[in-house]
């Protein structure tokens, strides 16, 4: 299995030990075709899904059930990896066979809930697709899901003068470091596969098409 990739929108470079622990503790983990994600067998049930989407609706495992879900963790002020990854996911969505598109949900989960309000998430994810989902939750509520998935993130203070738009709002300037892993949940909202390389569009498209075609 390839070493998980990292992206620093700041200066953070800590390895994703938590993600590796999630994979290693599962009874069986088998790689998909070369270049694809790591498929978990059996899928891992998730108990920490408790989010608020861009419309203010609560998202839990029961509300996510019924579709395949591709999760990416980031934040709306990420300068490059987040918009690049979401643009790639939008391309994957467009290339899915039309009959399969309703079976696959693409979701950005913000690890910056202090700034990423539902309104801001709605504006942001709407740039990539009308049916893209943006969600977050207060950190205490978000933490169980991050821990279950082994999501790596950290806040880094920025030098005075950067992001001056926040001046006067009582919010210190900071950026967020986060991993760029993609997590695929099955229609029972269980962790089904992990893609450590979000740039491998072909593998993601191939695997999603196969999985969503299954009865």
Which residue ranges define each predicted feature?
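Structural microenvironment flanking redox-active thiols in thiol-disulfide oxidoreductases
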Residues: 84-145
